[in-house]
Amino acid sequence: MIEETLLEAEEKMDKAVEVAKEDFSAVRTGRANPGLFAKVMVDYYGAPTPLQQLASFAVPEARTLLITPFDRSALGDIEKALSNSEVGANPSNDGNVIRVVMPELTQERRREYVKIVRGKSEDAKISIRNIRRKAKESLDKIVKDGDAGEDEGSRAEKELDGLTKTHTENIDELLKRKEAELLEV
């Protein structure tokens, strides 16, 4: 039961790190990146549909993104969704593809994005700490119920602390890389 609890905690912590990676990739850096549009929803035939399901992406230049819809009738809907998104993109529709040129980021905007990324990083760490707390409660209950000995419980707790530390360090490393990417001019 202890191993199952630790394995479950590790899987949840891995998921928290993955979510942080996705959140970080959604913060723009001045370069074109299809991940920026991961959460853009298009009103396609009356149903909100993720942009990735409607089009393919190409990055021909550092600040240009080409979006090629699988169905050309969706061009207008995609362009409208991009214009209304929080990405700050300026789409231009040439009838076949949508070209998005990412504007240069000002230093002030870069600092705002760094704050946003730090907030997302802290959210991920809080999530990891909550996972640790719940796993520790489960471990304590297992020991209290007599399903495992005190020694096993303390060994598992140390392993849980190691997992927490490793995953928190992963978040810190992701944050450091994203900050460097954002502040690079």
From Swiss-Prot:
GO terms for molecular function: ribosomal large subunit binding. GO terms for cellular component: cytoplasm. Its main location: cytoplasm. Keywords: Cytoplasm, Protein biosynthesis. Residues 142-165 are annotated as: Disordered. GO terms for biological process: translational termination. Gene3D superfamilies: 3.30.1360.40, Ribosome-recycling factor. It is found in: Cytoplasm. Belongs to the RRF family. HAMAP family: RRF. Responsible for the release of ribosomes from messenger RNA at the termination of protein biosynthesis. May increase the efficiency of translation by recycling ribosomes from one round of translation to another. PANTHER family: MITOCHONDRIAL RIBOSOME RECYCLING FACTOR PSEUDO 1, RIBOSOME RECYCLING FACTOR. This is Ribosome-recycling factor.
